[in-house]
Amino acid sequence: STGGWTSGAHGSYSTQEFISDEMLQEIAAVDGISGYDASIVSMPYYFKETGDSVVTTGYTNSFYTYGYVNTEYNDLFASGRFELVEGSHITEDMTNGLIISRERAEQNGLEVGSKVVGINDPYTDDPEVDMEIVGIFEVVADKNDEATMYDASTMWDFSEYAFCSKAAMEAMCVNYGDGNKIQEADFFVTDAAQLESVINEVQSISSINWDHFIVTANDEVYQNISSALSDTTTLVT
């Protein structure tokens, strides 16, 4: 979405329009779209039922966490960089699911079915949100190559990434105003040859003010996995 900040008599306020659940459903219903994901990103902390922190290898025990609708469509999984090795992906009907890496699960004695509590900032009055680990992923990379195990854009080791249900992230970030709103979403199409026509149909949805949003085509995932999959999809952002 587009927008920014402006000032008025009562201070500064956001001019950005965010993506609503209704918009997601309308776009997902367009013929030719096979699935979508939408995310909210934050760096919460997780705690075991004993009250002990779920620890990382970093200076703090926070996890770089995506609050997701459908983790199956996240580009880290779709491109093959992450592989779900236990449990299931987070889906739209899950409200409290959590996926963590095998490294952090083993370090903390956690497994699929373990209960944890998520808090965006445990040093404030942020709410405690009950979650359950539904999946465990492995970073598919050369573990001797530091560049493939670390995301320079976020400064987080990939093993300290996590994925939770969008509803759980919204609950954790309830004190942060626009911090729990969706700013972007990714949609997959079933046939790359129909990409342009699908985009045109999406942009013809009259209930969405397209002056406030940018639509781009991105085939990175398609290029990365087209040789491995027979039903490869192409990404629309």
Which positions does each model-derived feature cover?
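Basic-flanked hydrophobic alpha-helices used for secretion and membrane insertion
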Residues: 2-220
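Alpha-helical membrane-protein architecture signal
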Residues: 218-228
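Hydrophobic alpha-helical transmembrane segments of multi-pass inner-membrane transport and secretion
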Residues: 1, 226-237
